[in-house]
Amino acid sequence: MKTPPEPRVAAPRVFASPDISIVGGASSLESDLAMLGSLLDQTLARQVSGAFLDTVERVRQAADEDLDTSIEELEKLDLATTSQLVRAFSMYFHLANVAEQTHRGRQGRGDRDEDRGPLNRVTELIEDALAAGELKRADVEEAVRQLDVRPVFTAHPTEAARRSVLIKLRAVSDLLDERVSARRVANEDRRWRRAAEMVEELWLTDELRLEKPEVLDEARNALYFVDGLMRRPVTDVLLHLVDCLAAIGIELPVRARPLTFGSWIGGDRDGNPFVTPQVTTSVVDMSLDHSIRTMFLLFARLIDEISVSERHSEISKELDASLQKDLEVITNLDPRYRRLNYEEPYRLKLTCVRAKLESTLLRMQRRSRHQPGVDYHSSDELLDDLMLMYDSLMANGAEIIAHGTLEQSIRTVAAFGLTLTTLDVREHAEAHHAALGPLLDRVGQFDRPYLSLSREGRVELLSEEVASPRPLGLFPTALDGRDLTTFQTFESIRGLLNHFGPNACESYIISMTKGADDVLAAVVLAREAGLVELRSGVARIGFVPLFETIEELRRAGEITDQLLSVPSYRRLVALRGDVQEVMLGYSDSNKDAGIAASQWAIHRAER
């Protein structure tokens, strides 16, 4: 039976605005910490009791002054009070982290605005090196063209924060940012009342769910962050990169993709039986839905802004032909747009783009076939439409308009594509051998089981299989259980690529790679699923060995050399742009040898 709580010391609506005069300027970290601490104190007094707030303060002071005193103070508390105390300090640290992150972001933006950011410093170094003859401009331009940074989202088991909590912490961060530019005291009071509301909601919200989140829950949490990036921050970073490069006379092509995003959520099958092929498809469906709905907002703004009339500016022949074709094949276009925007070709084209996105979303929901010209199969098709407008504006004297919101939207679409992130799929090396065993044994070409072959024997056999156009047989009759699921994962990848285009999934990661045969086994399964056909020049995904243990990290170069010396595999790499991706180290590296040894092994492998 629960003990009744002590009477609360204040009515729920009682709120006292923190006094910023005692903690410095509005933008200081100390000010933010003090104000958030004050709001938390008020919440504890209202929602628990004044006596509890006194206890929190005594424990805090004891921890600052003397460890023994702190222990004595804690030993006096009952379990319920101790639990509340842990929550109180945890929440303070959450709020402190938010304040620090917001402060760092504020500093970064300030540095960028004053040309003191990291990109500014790098471009200054490049400019000095060019002037000194240490770098050639052609080499820098080529490096810019090849620039490819891809942060990857993953759902680590230790990341258990609920989206409800994340949203409230984000709101607190936004309020801290807004406070910097606040001018009126009334607005300041209103802002801190809103912050008090968020803090109180955080206190009354379960920090963790009682049930373990499912894969789709993890995906929703990740999409919360990606949505926020797509709405503005990534565009700002890309435009800053454009400005920095322009300062040294180098142009970043408008549809270049120097920054994209990847995700393991929904694709990381290693050790997680809940990541089924069906779940993988559902996660990508969800990502596409989020991406297109955010694009609706981007293009609504473009439609409002780009009201260029043919009465005042011509359009390119290419844009005119594309627009006429759109008007012929798009049946879900409201007739009034044809009438109202008849002499505003950019608005009309953007309205057609929006109609195609609506059809793309509908196609995904219905699992229907792609209709060229009616919906988009890939982000490249969407970018083609946007570039037609950009090129037309540039060719007809409207460069300022082209370089405005339209260019920003093109760079945003290039970064995120139709599915926001590119999915990486990962599976343990042994799973591929286990699935191949019964299939190869059934062929009957060998005098002993496939799984009993040495690594050298497997490499020889699998090298021939990768090059062979002969299928191993009908899988449903040969596989069951986990082996069937392993193969179906490759089938689901084929479905994703067919449905969402080549950017939906690009890399298949083989964890615990210990030899070239581990990668070749995955390639053979991919060939059976129609993802690889060397004689036809088909290599729809790349294969990434993941070296994790200390021994494999030491042998990473040797194993990679052996893999690339296999003619059939070398042909596959050539079809993928002559780039072999390798992944070094993961959490299992630390488990295998400890943090210091594993980091040193990774460092040596990278060199």
Residue positions per predicted region:
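Often metal-dependent polyanion-binding catalytic scaffolds in large enzymes
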Residues: 1-463, 480-482
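Short glycine-rich or small-residue beta-strand-to-loop segments that form or flank ligand, phosphate
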Residues: 90, 390-392, 507-511, 543-546
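A general structural signal for short secondary-structure junctions and capping/turn motifs
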Residues: 255-257, 265-266, 411, 498-500, ...
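Active-site cores of enzymes that catalyze phosphoryl transfer or operate on phosphate-rich substrates
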Residues: 329, 352, 359, 422-423, ...
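Generic non-transmembrane alpha-helix signal with a bias for helix starts/N-cap capping motifs
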Residues: 406, 605-606
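Interdomain boundary/hinge elements
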Residues: 536-543
